Regions:
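Catalytic or ion-coupling anion/metal-binding cores of large enzyme and transporter domains
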Residues: 1-21, 26-33, 63, 70, ...
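A short, small-residue-rich loop immediately preceding and capping a beta-strand
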Residues: 15-16, 23-25, 96-118, 130-134
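Glycine-rich anion/phosphate-binding loops
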Residues: 33-44, 467
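Low-complexity, highly charged intrinsically disordered N-terminal segments
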Residues: 39-61
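Short, hydrophobic/amphipathic alpha-helical packing segments
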Residues: 42-46, 89, 223
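N-terminal small/polar loop signature for handling phosphorylated ligands or for N-terminal nucleophile
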Residues: 62-99
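Well-ordered alpha-helical segments embedded in enzymatic catalytic cores
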Residues: 87-94, 117, 247, 430-434
Length: 598
């Protein structure tokens, strides 16, 4: 391997990544990757390794690639999506422990499950100097559709809105660069924001354009940071404090981040040995922190993520939150400096001025229209990010990205109120078939149950939300499910309903014809989802709870017949460790205690 005896005494550093595909030196594919997010990051890993060597270290590299949720949505491949995260985190930790001489770790990752897995892995090895290198974003196309819109081509093709040739052409043009995560603030982009916000990544590293010099520079700066951490006796556990996680949750709210981070942030906290945030913690932060970023898919203007980077990214948003006293700026990042110190430098930096000017000159966009002041955000109609409705259907709670509800179905006081008959399905496939067969009508409440961790590995039901989005009356149909959603999903979609149907939750007892009432106040962030009637009867929520308690779980819901044993095991283990609201983690102490008591 080219080892030099003279270098073996150097400090050993490990560069982990989610690299996928086989890329020739000229950039041409030898073998395709699953997605753009892992296609180019070997270049970042190489840049980091070269820097580590230049700084006197001896770099090692190891890989564990990651899947693409966009590729598996609507298929049984989605049953492995969330479980993969836990598996990959374990693999990364095993790889790190397999290099017992390691002095520090760099984790290069980009996308929906690979990046949270990497963050969990590094957090679980907090005694080491470590840093995340975000894999950046792809550039939006000059012609055609962005990566968010193009994910709806399946629904549009099935409704005769596109030919197969048109769909194929749009899909191949969706990304204007070969690498990077999707151009919208889905789970991948939100995870990058969160990594930087909690101090795991160097400042202004989230959402950088993949393949560009500034993107490679992030890898170099990250290597500098880890070596400096080693020299100064700083470890990742010194960065990942309870306040750091609160900062991450505040940035999630300010950006309008993906609801999947409600699964990932608690999991990272668990791995770091920090108390996991509760629904009440999330709710309190979203009530206090305004959304001030105008980005896909939330709008209203729908800027791609690279514009958010050019407008200043995480540091620029932090400047606004510091003014509002909504973040703890005494916290440190992997640079060893406090957020206060970094923001003071950022505010006057040439880097900030240069990138904001690039956005003005090249795109003709005012940076202050991408990352807005709280006052301008209110004027533009930006609303808080998520809320957590509860009720007799969701006694343990549920979640909705309330800022993504179509404004035309929200009244002047900011309230979405919907009451309608339930159409109940036990799989996403059956629900989509009903839409294709025109069995869903305006005013319906679409219920998809049996799709939580036990049923399907808690699949994403994006194909369903995208199908509704392109129905003329789709905004007048609500969705309630114990599954989860893609970070690009929009609409009146209530997910993560708990307890899940297969765990005896009320959502698994609903019947077609039941009357469901949904009320969501986007100003107070208070919401409810209740059974309030049967076919020819109406009653209040309290009576609805009594009736649901008397019902048996539907006899037609069961774990999907194609659910892999790997995922069945994951579902059982995460259920012992706190389930969905606990981040779907493997709490080993609880699992062992459960086994020993049985």
């Amino acid at each position: 391997m080219g080892w030099k005896a003279s270098e073996l005494g150097r400090d050993h550093y490990l560069v982990l990544s989610t690299q996928g595909g086989l890329r020739a030196p000229d950039g041409q594919p030898v073998a395709l990757g699953f997605h753009t997010g892992h296609w180019e990051i070997a270049l970042q890993a190489e840049a980091a390794a070269e820097r580590l060597h230049k700084l006197g270290g001896l770099p090692f590299a190891a890989f564990c690639s990651d899947p693409c949720d966009g590729r598996t949505q609507g298929t049984v491949g989605m049953f492995d999506s969330l479980p993969y995260r836990n598996d990959a985190a374990q693999v990364f930790r095993r790889l790190a422990r397999s290099l017992p001489t390691r002095k520090g770790i760099l984790g290069v990752a980009t996308c929906d499950k690979g990046l949270p897995a990497m963050m969990m892995a590094l957090a679980g090895m907090g005694d080491l100097p470590s840093a995340i290198v975000p894999g950046g974003v792809s550039l939006p196309p000059e012609q055609g559709e962005d990566a968010g819109a193009v994910q709806t081509i399946g629904a549009r093709f099935s409704h005769g809105m596109l030919s197969l040739d048109e769909a194929t052409e749009l899909g191949c043009k969706a990304c204007a660069s070969p690498g990077g995560g999707c151009q919208f603030l889905g789970t991948a982009a939100t995870s990058q924001v969160v990594a930087e916000a909690m101090g795991m990544a160097v400042p202004h590293s989230a959402l950088a354009p993949s393949g560009q010099p500034v993107w490679l520079d992030i890898a170099t700066r990250s290597a500098d940071a880890v070596v400096a951490m080693k020299q100064n006796g700083l470890a990742l556990k010194d960065i990942l404090t309870p306040a750091a996680f609160k900062n991450a949750m505040a940035l999630h709210a300010a950006f309008g981040g993906s609801t999947n981070l409600l699964l990932h942030i608690p999991a990272i906290a668990y791995c770091a040995g920090i108390e996991r945030p509760t629904v009440n913690d999330w709710s309190a932060i979203n009530k206090a922190v305004p959304r001030i970023v105008d980005v896909l898919p939330n709008g209203p203007t729908h800027h791609p993520t690279v514009r958010v980077f050019l407008a200043g990214g995480v540091p620029e948003v932090m400047l606004h939150l510091r003014e509002l006293n909504l973040i703890d700026t005494s916290q440190r990042s992997v640079t060893g400096r406090t957020i206060d110190q970094e923001l003071n430098d950022w505010e006057e930096s040439e880097r900030r001025h240069r990138f904001r000017e690039i956005l003005k000159e090249q795109d003709g966009v005012d940076p202050d229209d991408v990352i807005l002041s709280p006052e301008r955000a209110r004027e533009r109609g930006l609303t808080s990010t998520v809320m957590f409705p509860s009720g007799n259907i969701a006694p343990d709670g549920a979640v909705i990205k309330s800022t993504a509800i179509d404004p035309s179905v929200v009244d002047e006081s900011g309230v979405y109120a919907h009451e309608g008959p339930a159409k109940v399905f036990t799989s996403e496939h059956d629900a989509i078939a009903a839409i294709k067969q025109n069995e869903i009508e305006a005013g319906d409440v679409l219920v998809v149950t049996g799709c939580g961790p036990i049923g399907t590995g808690m699949e994403e039901t994006y194909q369903l939300t995208s199908a509704l989005k392109f129905l003329p009356f789709g905004k007048h149909v609500a969705l309630v499910t114990d599954a989860r959603f893609s970070g690009v999903s929009t609409g009146a979609c209530i997910g993560h309903v708990g307890p899940e149907g297969l765990a005896g939750g009320p959502v698994g007892k609903l019947k077609t014809g039941d009357v469901i009432s949904i009320r969501l106040d986007r100003n107070t962030l208070e919401g409810s989802v209740n059974l309030v009637g049967e076919v020819d009867d109406r009653f209040d929520a309290e009576e609805g709870a009594k009736r649901l308690a008397k019902r048996e779980t539907r006899d037609d819901i069961a774990p999907h017949s194609a659910l892999p044993d790997d995922t069945r095991l994951w579902a059982a283990l995460q259920g012992v460790g706190g389930g969905t609201w606990g981040g779907c983690v493997f709490d080993v102490d609880q699992i062992v205690a459960k086994l020993q008591s049985s």
